[in-house]
């Protein structure tokens, strides 16, 4: 997003390119008049133009939220072994971009850098006359301009190197297209509800497949979902149901909303090289949208969009139906810090009514509480979202996993879109992307000061805060803790508590362990952090207790029986203080599939 400059300090990509003239300013100059003999005339014919200093940019990006997003994407990139992991966080009410990250990225201070692995890859591909890294026209040009095998290999390496660097420098969020998959079903639902061709109570019986012209389109649940209403159709991510919604709309109305939500145009974000969708290439035109094309488009297949288009559309549902212009520059300042210009939120158009938006938001919340998006659940924050898993066009066996959401569902502040390109093993957005979004949502809303509102069921499962025991007698402290259900370990022979772990007010489980130290110079007890990954909640709790550690659960504890741990806040094998709280992240692999082969 920031981009970089060349050796001449001229912007080459990102904001450095977009705002190069503004950031650089204008050099001063003197214009003199000459007489017929090329001699200088009097000063009265001289014009002096003072230099104008460049302005500085203040971005909408929040460095804390940016770090949350980047850290989470780096983890899922490593775990999924995908080709890339991408994410964006937007203020749903203004269009301001709060965070944007592309993993694998590049070093802004050394944009030409390649890893040893990348260099080896370039060298190997350069020897091939059918390298997948080269287009047919590039290979043809190399063959025409180089006579020897060595020359052609060198030319290939140069082109492949440049291709690889250009790919690194591209901002996937604004410049690349992807297959949105089932996340797009929220658009189909919005259109169907707005046009009154369906209601939340409209029912459909899914048998596991549907016949469209000469094709059989399958649901990811081969045995079918049975009879379900529209809300459960979205929760279950049922393809046949949404095919029928698209067919009820008809091609003309479907295209009208496809266009209204911004999928046929640029969003207008203030970054360079935003991709312009090409009719007939990236999406079906109205003239070419037959029953098959309409049906596949209705559940998010057979067309491509940019991530910035998708999160802008998601934000429109979150904010009551207004399609905003996304932006990253909040204001420009002169050399003295004075505001030269300031970006104002821009509503491009109203795409659906507030009533429809609220209905869809409620349906999306059910996706997270009980549907394919359950791994995006965050206790105390109502999250509304939709999972997506799509097969790449013309690339059988390769997938894009994604999840789009906003929170809090009842009073939205932020929208989050997470995309993993070509994951290995688990391919579903409900498995891969939802936990990432949950972490970003939880940490971001906490940082923003958004207060949690717990349900009665959540209240029963809440962690507690360690009481202040310093200064109490050991006897009184132990009596209080045992009465409250805590386990107690005492270190030292003193009769008063000098310090404790966890410290006062730190988060810990209601039945956790507290260590009481009674001597100032007593050695602190330590514990080795186990590897909690791959365990059930019960197994994690037992292992933590036997290891002398407290556990904070992150995940939908209301569905504890189907949860498996996948990450932890302190690395396995690390030495930490006895009684410290370790956050263990859980997700479900049950009922989160949303893709049919």
Predicted regions and their residues:
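Acidic/histidine-enriched alpha-helical segments
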Residues: 19, 82-94, 205-209, 273-275, ...
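Solvent-exposed, polar/charged alpha-helical surfaces in well-ordered, non-transmembrane soluble domains
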Residues: 2-3, 13, 17, 21, ...
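Beta-lactam-recognizing serine transpeptidase/beta-lactamase-like catalytic domain environment
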Residues: 35-48, 93-182, 187-420
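Short beta-alpha junctions and helix-cap segments that line functional grooves
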Residues: 72-73, 174, 298, 403, ...
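Flexible, solvent-exposed loop/hinge segments and secondary-structure transition points
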Residues: 65, 72-94, 101-105, 110, ...
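Ligand-recognition elements built from short beta-strands and adjacent flexible loops
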Residues: 280-282, 343, 380, 385, ...
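Conserved, well-ordered alpha-helix/loop/beta-strand core segments that scaffold catalytic motifs
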Residues: 42-85
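Small/polar-residue-rich segments within soluble enzyme cores
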Residues: 1-54, 418, 435
């Amino acid at each position: 997003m920031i981009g970089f400059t060349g050796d001449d300090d001229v912007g080459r990509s990102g904001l450095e390119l977009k705002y190069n003239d503004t950031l650089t300013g204008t050099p001063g100059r003197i214009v003199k008049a000459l007489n017929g003999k090329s001699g200088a005339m009097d000063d009265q014919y001289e014009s002096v133009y003072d230099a104008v200093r460049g302005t500085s940019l203040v971005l909408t990006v929040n460095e804390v939220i940016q770090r949350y997003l980047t850290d989470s994407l780096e983890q899922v990139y490593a775990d999924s072994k995908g080709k890339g992991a991408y994410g964006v966080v937007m203020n749903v009410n203004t269009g301001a971009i709060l965070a944007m990250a592309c993993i694998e990225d590049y070093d802004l201070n050394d944009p030409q850098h390649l890893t040893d692995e990348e260099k080896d890859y370039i060298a190997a591909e350069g020897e091939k006359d059918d390298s997948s890294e080269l287009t047919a026209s590039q290979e043809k040009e190399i063959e025409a301009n180089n006579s020897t095998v060595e020359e052609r290999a060198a030319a290939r390496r140069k082109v492949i190197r440049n291709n690889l660097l250009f790919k690194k420098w591209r901002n996937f969020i604004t410049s690349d297209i992807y297959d949105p998959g089932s996340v797009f079903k929220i658009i189909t639902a919005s259109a169907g509800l707005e046009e009154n061709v369906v209601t939340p109570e409209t029912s459909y019986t899914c048998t596991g497949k549907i016949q469209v012209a000469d094709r059989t389109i399958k649901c990811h649940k081969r045995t079918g979902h049975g009879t379900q209403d529209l809300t459960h159709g979205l929760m279950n991510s049922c393809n046949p149901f949404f095919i029928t919604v698209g067919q009820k709309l008809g091609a003309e109305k479907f295209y009208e909303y496809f266009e209204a939500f911004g999928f046929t145009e640029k969003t207008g974000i203030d970054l360079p090289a935003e991709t312009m969708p090409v009719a007939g290439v990236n999406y079906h035109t109205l003239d070419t949208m037959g029953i098959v094309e309409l049906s596949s488009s209705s559940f998010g297949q057979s067309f491509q969009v940019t991530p910035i288009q998708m999160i802008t559309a998601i934000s429109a549902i979150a904010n009551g139906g207004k399609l905003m212009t996304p932006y990253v520059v909040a204001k420009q300042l002169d050399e003295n810090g004075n505001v030269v210009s300031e970006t104002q939120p821009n509503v491009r158009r109203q795409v659906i009514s507030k009533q429809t938006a609220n209905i869809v938001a409620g349906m999306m919340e059910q996706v997270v509480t009980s549907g394919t998006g359950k791994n995006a659940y965050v206790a105390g924050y109502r999250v509304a979202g939709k999972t997506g898993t799509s097969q790449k066009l013309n690339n059988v066996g390769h997938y894009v996993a994604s999840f789009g959401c906003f929170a809090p569902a009842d009073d939205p502040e932020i929208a989050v879109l997470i995309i993993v390109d070509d994951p290995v093993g688990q391919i579903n957005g409900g498995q891969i992307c939802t936990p990432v979004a949950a972490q970003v949502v939880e940490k971001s809303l906490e940082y923003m000061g958004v207060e949690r509102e717990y349900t009665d069921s959540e209240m029963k499962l809440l962690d507690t805060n360690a009481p202040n025991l310093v200064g109490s007698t050991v006897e009184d402290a132990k009596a209080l803790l045992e009465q409250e259900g805590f386990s107690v370990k005492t270190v030292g022979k003193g009769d008063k508590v000098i310090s404790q772990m966890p410290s006062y007010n730190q988060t810990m489980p209601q039945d956790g362990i507290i260590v009481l130290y009674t001597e100032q110079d007593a050695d602190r007890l330590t514990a080795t952090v186990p590897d909690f990954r791959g365990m059930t909640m019960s197994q994690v709790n037992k292992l933590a207790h036997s290891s002398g550690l407290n556990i904070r659960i992150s995940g939908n504890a209301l569905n504890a029986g189907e949860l498996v741990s996948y990450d932890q806040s302190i690395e396995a094998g690390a030495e930490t203080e006895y009684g410290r709280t370790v956050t263990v992240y859980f997700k479900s692999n049950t009922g989160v599939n949303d893709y049919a082969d």
